[in-house]
Amino acid sequence: MKHQLRLYQREAFRFLKRNGSSGFFVEMRMGKTLVMIRLLRRMRRPILVVAPGSAIGSWIDDLVDEEQPYTTLLGSRAQRLKTLATGLAFGRGWFLINKEGHRALPELANVSWGAVILDESHFIKNPKAKVTKFYTKNFRDVPYRYVLTGTPNPESRLDMVTQFIFTHGHCCGFTNYWSFEHAMTTSFDGYTKKLKKTAREAMVSFVSRNAYVLDRASAGMDVEKVIRTRYIEMPPKVRKAYDKLEKDFVLELGDVYESHLWRMSQYAALRSLCSGVLPSQEEGGGWLWDGKVRELLDLLEGELAEQQVVVWFSFIQPMRLVAANLAKEKISCTYIDGSVPMVERFERIRKFNAGGARVILVQERVGESGIKLAAADTAVYFTEPPGLVTKQQSEDRILLVEKQSILLIPFVVPNTVEHDIHKALGMKKREALTFLNEAMRRRALRGSK
């Protein structure tokens, strides 16, 4: 064992050892993985870890450091079955699989696991999702079940219900999500569900007893996140087309006429216009308007001159166009998106962290977990993701405990869906932190008695 556990890690270790199946809700880069490995390293039965594909590498690094045997269940169904059988022949060790892996390998549910760990466990927050049903209906005989995440309630406090049904078989005494929702929530508009006041109290108490909750500030490891939002106006012609699309579900701009009758299609088209490209734009097309890329170039050649920077994108087309603009200005850059093979992604990340590229462009879905881009102290959001989990995960890609602060620069087009997303992210973050801080306070009070 090379690394000594920090004080808060030792406290978490004792909590998890005493409580058994638990939630482990601490922020990223605080060593959740190491605590779990130390906790379960003497287990004689196999241990299953389910994590985002991009986070599996971090587990492997820590398992190697701790000299623990591991097996990765990746590849085709035939390959996974063979690897699982070979690994189980040894009777113990760690088995790592991506969060979609159950579709190719449902036999996971039939293995006599000693422990099952869901890393970034908010992937089972939706009670209707097949992945949620798979993990909450199976593994009931596994003696130790854990959910790990820094954001257990990214959109709502209800996000935690199915996570605790996985770990404990119930949440506040309710064994399924729908009975919990019926008894514990109310709705003012017939659609949005909110916890009743008494239910909120019960939920805070339940979480404080059944999860270890800690943020960086409470652990003395806080890194200040400095946010400097840049508001960038559309040109009048594009603004007029945007407003018509928002009102009439039709995009009319020059020779372009597109109908977006479905809400999701309209929403995607509105976001695309905000990023500077047409919704239906094919590979090789240019900018519809270039306000954001000009702002980015001004920053890279001005305030951020000589600095390494991460730039986040929701859409691939503007990312490719930005790469071309940077090349034209002789600013060294690399990029990772879904088209880049996994091995090549890590090579490009290594190159960036080694100083071989000044800028790295990242598609949010590819880079939201498991990668480290700590060579940069600044992240620019060409488009902000609508989900709090993705936003916080992306922020933490450049975070190191040793840093005093990091700079986050969202690009926002005023009075658009982008502006709505920007404001909603702030509200979601405040709501999530308020609840978890109360759970932390309760646990601290219990511990002092």
Give the predicted meaning of each segment:
Residues 1-3, 17-21, 29-30, 35-44, ...:
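Conserved Helicase C-terminal RecA-like lobe
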Residues 28-29, 142-157:
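Conserved helicase ATPase motor motifs in RecA-like P-loop NTPase domains
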Residues 33, 102-107, 155-157, 319-323, ...:
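SF2 helicase motor core recognition
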Residues 35, 44-65, 154-159, 315-316:
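Conserved Walker A/P-loop ATP-binding site and its immediately adjacent core
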Residues 55-78, 167-171:
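Conserved helix-turn-beta segment of the N-terminal RecA-like "Helicase ATP-binding" lobe
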Residues 73-82, 98-104, 125-128, 313-317, ...:
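Conserved helicase motor
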Residues 96-101, 106-112, 130-143, 173-285, ...:
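Inter-lobe coupling linker of SF2 helicases/translocases
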Residues 386-449:
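A conserved SF2-helicase RecA2
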